[in-house]
Amino acid sequence: MIKWGLFGAVKPFRSMVPLSQTRSLIISKSSLVRSKRVSTIRPQLAPVNPYSKIYGRRFFSSSHKLGVNTKEDSSTYLFGRKISTSESKMLKSLLVTIWPKNKPSFKLRVIFALSLLIASKLLNVEVPFFFKKIIDEMNVDWNDQLGTVGTVIGTLIIAYGGARFGAVLFGELRNAVFASVAQTAIKRVAHNTFVHLLNMDLNFHLSRQTGGLTRAIDRGTKGISYVLNAMVFHIIPISFEISMVCGILIYNYGLSFAAVTLATMLSYSVFTIKTTAWRTGFRRQANNADNQAATVALDSLLNYESVKYFNNEGFQASKYNTALTNYQNASVKVATSLAYLNAGQNFIFTSALTAMMYMGCNGVATGSLTVGDLVLINQLVFQLSVPLSFLGSVYRELKQSLLDMENLFQLQNHEIKIKDASNAKPLLLNSTGVPGEIKFENVTFGYHPDRPILQNASFTIPAGEKIAIVGPSGSGKSTILRLIFRFYDVESGKIFIDGQDISKVTVESLRRSIGIVPQDTPLFNDTILENIRYGRLDATDKEIHEMIDKVQLTKLIEDSPNGVNTIVGERGMMISGGEKQRLAIARLLLKRAPITLFDEATSALDTHTEQSLLRTIRKVLTKKANTHIAIAHRLRTIADADKIIVLNKGQVQEEGTHHNLLQNPNSLYSQLWNIQENLDIDEELNEYAKETEEQK
């Protein structure tokens, strides 16, 4: 009986036993792309001084690029105090988003919104003056001047109502005009962060907490919206309104009223700033606990089957409850400290209002002030309560939003390790002959400095040949595929494709030339059709159906209620492992890449389906004289390869054809083959029996 390998027909060399009897002896290996493991190590963030304050002198440099570290140590001030470097960079970055270069229409919209805001504040300050005049005009003899007084008062009432309505109208128009500005800024930052995350290396994503990342982005974008509105439409306008009120009080009523007002502003601001700085630590604790809770929940749901396999629902619920308890405790501290802040602010303002009312009543009693003046002073000071209370709210919410934005901008500050060199050029494959020669020259690489995976590995994969890479677990097989695909850069040595150093070609052109079937096939929560189309986005439905037939997915399509439009579930959990691998192979064939990599591409298939699919793959690959590399533990599937490279301890121990390697009975390949061919099965079973007996 003829067996089929990945690259062609293979005749049996000796008596073979069913794979089911020897599968337990096949040496296992790590997958090319593992399911993401949640790291318990929180990303190290730049320290934020909890006592840094906000309220403004030196402002922003328009040359600052979004999310880019700068070496300048220029200080930024807000609310009269120096804020931290990280907060300064965030504020500068936000200014760029609302005042972008080469977008005059965008700038005009910002200017128009600011104009509406100023008009709203001017009308708002006029309202108490109309009220004062109405009161004073009422204090006359109506019998002598009924018509005149009625006309004047009627006009003042209309003006009063018009000013109040106009202030509200201009304020709402301002919000409408600025809405697109804020949303555009949010979209830009979120998009840039997402693109930056996609450009990060594989190691970054394998070591990060997915739930924490998504929550940080969500809170960060909301924080951007608040900061933009607070900075542009509240801090400056509130300062403008307070200045106008103080000026009016000094001009009309002397320094005493203005002194009380200024003392109130100062006391209010100092109390708010100090208390908010104290509360910042509680908010940061709440954010960290919130991130941890989101991470635990997401990790538990992504690993739903593992939770069920080991009956650990209670354990996961306990972990989630612990994270929620930490968040609850931190949130209680946030709420109680907020109550203290609000009570203190109200006490300061109420004391000031009481003092000014006493001074005003005393003026009326002595005849130096009219009743209208008393009303005006009361209205002006009381009117300040809204922006003043909002000023405190703005400060504490601004600090909170900056904390929420902190992780978002820290993500953008992570260095992209795998990127194009300054002089990178597109990969040019051999156009005159067969493309895809791959050469490793003294390559050394390890995921950790103290544990190298490859050590001075050198070998050549000829163009157009079918190469298999085998070896014990941890010998570096999957690492080679990752390095070819440039998920990582080598520590030393070089990798060439058609004579070009892959570190000096563009990453996009390199990966466009390579197709891969990973052992763990990640799929999108989309239809079968769209998951296959992901291999080549411009592929037609007809081409996709051809690939479905070639990889024998027709039965799955026929049995599915929605056919090719069946949703495969998150990461493909709603279809079997074998179906996922066939779908991945269909996606690879659709890509038409000149270099193809197979990492245990048929490990989840039964023997019959595997043999049938291998024949199909061989036919497709034979038509294209390209380079094909396969990693396998089932040595029968790669025995027909043009060359087999045997790795051991990070180095090439031997290489050759299947026949040549078997001629040396002491070769590592022969040992692996003999184990799988059951020649040593009795010895293995005896050792297993002894170990079992010892354990008893």
Swiss-Prot record:
Belongs to the ABC transporter superfamily. ABCB family. Heavy Metal importer (TC 3.A.1.210) subfamily. GO terms for molecular function: ABC-type transporter activity; ATP binding; ATP hydrolysis activity. Residues 110-400 form the ABC transmembrane type-1 domain. InterPro entries: AAA+_ATPase (IPR003593), ABC1_TM_dom (IPR011527), ABC1_TM_sf (IPR036640), ABC_transporter-like_ATP-bd (IPR003439), ABC_transporter-like_CS (IPR017871), P-loop_NTPase (IPR027417), Type_1_exporter (IPR039421). This is Iron-sulfur clusters transporter ATM1, mitochondrial. Residues 438-674 form the ABC transporter domain. The chain crosses the membrane at residues 110-131, 155-178, 228-251, 253-273, 340-358, 374-395. Glutathione binds at R279, T280, G281, F282, R283, N342, A343, G344, Q345, G392. Homodimer.
